[in-house]
Every structure is written in C-alpha cells, then in structure tokens.
Amino acid sequence: MFKRPLTLSLLASLIALTTSTAQAATVDLRVLETTDLHSNMMDFDYYKDKPTEKFGLVRTASLIEAARQQATNSVLVDNGDLIQGSPLGDYMAAKGLKAGEIHPVYKAMNTLDYAVGNIGNHEFNYGLDYLKKSLAGAKFPYVNANVIDVKTGKPLFQPYLIVDTPVKDRDGKNHNLRIGYIGFGPPQVMIWDKANLTGKVTVDDITETAKKWVPEMRKQGANLVVAIPHSGLSSDPYKTMAENSVYYLSQVPGIDAIMFGHAHAVFPSKDFATIKGADIAQGTLNGIPAVMPGQWGDHLGVVDFVLNNDQGQWQVTQAKAEARPIFDKATQKSLAAENANLMKVLAADHQGTRDFVSQPIGTASDNMYSYLSLIQDDPTVQIVNNAQRAYTEHFIQGDPDLADLPVLSAAAPFKAGGRKNDPASFVEVEKGELTFRNAADLYLYPNTLVVVKASGADVKQWLECSAAQFNQIDVNSSKPQSLINWDSFRTYNFDVIDGVNYEIDVSQPARYDGECALINDKAERIKNLTFNGKPIDPQATFLIGTNNYRAYSGKFAGTGDSHIAFASPDENRAVLSAYISAETKKHGQVTPQADNNWRLATLNSQQPLDIRFETSPSTKAAEFIKQKAQYPMKAMGTDEIGFAVFKIDLQK
C-alpha cells in the first residue's frame, strides 16, 4: 500500500528536477556608466578654444559602442552632474530653455539608449525650474530617493525603478531580468545650493535611505539592484549625512552593484588600494562590484555580471568592474575615436557655445596663469578677489550697518592641476583682449557672490583651514618631501584672503584637516597676520566677499547662516566680467598683478631641504616660473601622471 505514494512522490520530484534543469540558465550582463560629464559633450576645450582627445562624450560614446558589441546583454546608466560645468552648460543656462527645447546634453544622450539617470548635486545650480525644463528633454527616466519634496514629504523624483529587461542566456534563450535602479545625491547640496533649495526640498542620509528602499525593491521583484549614488568613496567611520557614502552603501544588504561618481576620481585604481575591503584587481568593494569612471567622459564604467537561476531565482555568481579610459596617459594616445553621429547632433550647439564664450569683455595688461597659484600670490586669484572686493564695497554704500566695515575677499584657485589628475588643468589667460571664455577660465563655477561678517579671530582660523593644503615639512630631513597635500585637500578650499597680509609656516603641523575639522588645537601655521600694517584685532569685524558654497558651509570660521551679511543675486563670474569691463573702460585695461599679500614663511634648517612641488609640464609654465617664481625653483623632471616636478627652496 506504500508503493503507489512512493512512485508518485518520486515522479513529482523527477518532474520538478527536469523542469528546474530545463529552466536553469546562465546570463552575462554588462552595466555601463558615465558620470560627472559636466556638459562636456564635445571633445573640445572651450577655454583654450582647441580640440582635445582627453575628454568628451563624443569619444566616450565610441567606448560605449565597443563595450556593447562585446556583450550579449548590456544597459547604460548616467550618474549626474550633467547640465553644469563647461561653457556649453553656461551657454544654455544664460540663454534659457524655451518650451519644448531640448538641452544639448540630452540631444546627445538620447542617441545612446540610456536606461536611467541619477541627479547630481550640480543639477541644482540653476534652480529647480531650470532643472525640470532640462529633464523634460531626456528620453530616459530619472531616479533619486533622498531628495525630499517639503510639501509632500515624499521623494521629489521617482526613488527607484524596476525595469523588465530582455536578456539572452548563454544558450541563446530569451529571459526577462527585472533590474532595479536607485539613485542618491549628497546631502550637502542643501548647503551648496541653499538659495535654490531652502523651503522646497530636504535631503536625507544616503545609507539610511538605501536601507529603507532596497528591501522594498526586492519585495517588488527586483532580480538585481543597481545603486547609482552621486557620492564618493571614503573609509572614514560612518557619520550620518556623510557626503561620501559609497563604502557604507557596499554594506547595505540587497545591493548588487554600485555605479558611483561625484569625486572625479577613478575606481578601481591604485588610488584606492589601501581602503579595507577594496579589491582593485576585481573591482569590488566589500565584495560588491563598484565603479567610478572619472570625469567629463574620460572613462567608461563597466561592471560585468554572471547570473544564474538554477536555484529557481536569479543570483549573481560572478562580478567584476573596471573603468576604461578614452586616453592613454602613458603613451599620450587616444583610445577612442569621435562618434560621428554625436558630432553631427551637437554641431549647432557647439558653434553657439564657441560664439558665446568669444564675446569680448575687456583688455588685460598681462598674462594670467595659475601654474604657481598654490605656493604664492597669483594673478588668477588676485583678479577674482579684486572684483569681489570692488563689488562688495559698492554694494554696501549707504548701508548704516555695513558701510563702515572693512572689506576683505576670499578666493581660491579652481584650476591648478585638478585633483592631481590633470596636468593640463591650469588657467591660461593671455594678455590683450579678454572674452567671456577667459572669465569662465578664471572662475570655473556658477557660484553666486555672498558676503559674510567675520571677526579678526575668524579670519585667522579661516586661513589656518586653508593652510591645511600643505604637508608639514620636516626641517631635519634631507629626503624629498612633497609640499602639497593632494590626497586630503582640494585646491578649491585653498582660500587666499585679500585685504590682509600673512605668512604660512609649513614647518608647523596643520591645525585643521582637509574638511576644516580641528585636528590639533595647539598648531599654528599663520604667522604675522596684519591689517593695515598692524596685527589684526581678533575682536574687529570684517566683511568678506566669497561664494555661496563657502559662505553657507559653516565649515570655515566666519561662515554659516549666522554670519551672512548679504547674498548677492549675481554670479561671481558675472561680477568678475563686470569688473574687467569697468576697469577697461576706466583705465584702458585691467591690471591683474598679484599684490603679494601672502607668502610661504622662510624655513630655518641646518641642512639643505628637498621640497617638491608639482605643476604644469608645459614650456609656457617653465618660462612663467623662470620669470615669476618668488622662491628659487629647479626642474626635477615629470612624475608618472605627467606633472612637472620642481624643487622649491624655502630657505632663502
């Protein structure tokens, strides 16, 4: 009597096994990523008015095409910072988008079959209305889970998407793979674009948002979850609202891949080899495939999956990631041709941009190069500070609360080698006629001018924070020592404050880290700080012209909401252009000479010091250094990235 049930049970098991085996399949899936394109659609440097092989989506597109041809199944995503960042973006923002007009970035990207895009922090630079008009031109959807609409309390954008994606397995059979995409942006956008966003949106923590939504995506049937955070990679201990949250995302259960960006760096690469859990050879972070493909289209992110469903559901069995460059820095050769179709699509807007940046604004008496802007007072920063001070002094006339306060200005070198990843990224403005192209070269970002009210003590601490740019020099060592703290400090945080005089003693330890957090309360690098020839009064009150990013950040002493004196509606770049025009009308030309209000302090040592500084490798830079360097400098060759290395003598 037990024979029949046993036979039926065995038969059922065999049928189930046969069905499972018949349905079992292995699928290869490639996920491609672009990020931080910053409107660099063309392979063209509008600041120099010359073609380039080193960036531009028209070249990345060729890598995209090749990567797709190599794969049976592929999808393409973009990670934002798209509509701002090059003269093409400036051109479109200046003229505005008419109803139904498509932004050039989407004219190009709509031809490449993107599956989805994420919102970057720079998408908010021109306000929510302009962003909405721009996004309307995209033929692909957008996701972002942590930007919250104040009115509704819900995400402003679609938080995630699950896309039914047809794929072929290794036997050529068709399947449906449900790919989930979720996007995130840095919470700091509420500081950086405070004027555009306050009262309209809030931004939640990236990691906590992921923990909320990823289980929901799995519940809704996502076979694969691809996170697209506009956020960088840091292994610092977790902090709520961290700007760079990718490491913590890699520890969130349910995420299968991280396509990240924001930091303008390349992962996997040796730059991240020391991070615990980072497998540079495999391209994984805590076992999760992750990729960050640089900036401006100079790399394409590639994640390759092998998925298998022999257990009845799709599971990742293998995964690896890489970032493919469009240019070989070692051989100085292009690795990607121009995409002819994109060149055609962009032709009219490209010419419009060239015409836009060629508008004359004035005349300069001398060249303005930023080759030495990190180590001495410099004309490219000086002219910005001059413009900001002139604007502020004019603005406060007649104001009973502000008119009698002394005016200072803070500005930083925006183009001084990038993040030590671009030996060509320096300001190069020639004397003679100046155009808007030159103003954009001198002031890279569409920031607005904001004036803060700060004490003399704040000025000192502000400068101490800026001085974290330098490594501490050991005066008892004769070994080569690198002067610039490239790893932990961004040059756009190296504020020069004009209107005061001071020296920076790099033999002393830094008081603050690269994020302006106090690390040594006994350290002092700023020496001989004076105002009008006298030691600065810590109790005195000053107005400091700066930009919205710095003013609202609260990181530097003297910044934050409580210090705001007034917020101008004008962009710093427009202020600079107007200053150049006014000076030209008044004097026939603008004179961009550094006033040398700061310098590196002379170092005392019993032996010769070998201090190294990196800058442009061009012959133009070498000649400029020969003529303008305030310290003796000796060329020592080039480093592996291509920067010229100089030995700088701070003992004289």
From Swiss-Prot:
Q: Where does substrate bind?
A: 445, 549-555
Stated EC number for the protein is: 3.1.3.6, 3.1.4.16
Q: Which reaction does it catalyse?
A: a nucleoside 2',3'-cyclic phosphate + H2O = a nucleoside 3'-phosphate + H(+); a ribonucleoside 3'-phosphate + H2O = a ribonucleoside + phosphate
Return the CDD domains for the record: MPP_CpdB_N
Give the residues the record marks as binding a divalent metal cation 1. Answer: 36, 38, 81, 264
Keyword Nucleotide-binding tagged: yes
First-level EC class:
hydrolase
The entry's protein name is 2',3'-cyclic-nucleotide 2'-phosphodiesterase/3'-nucleotidase
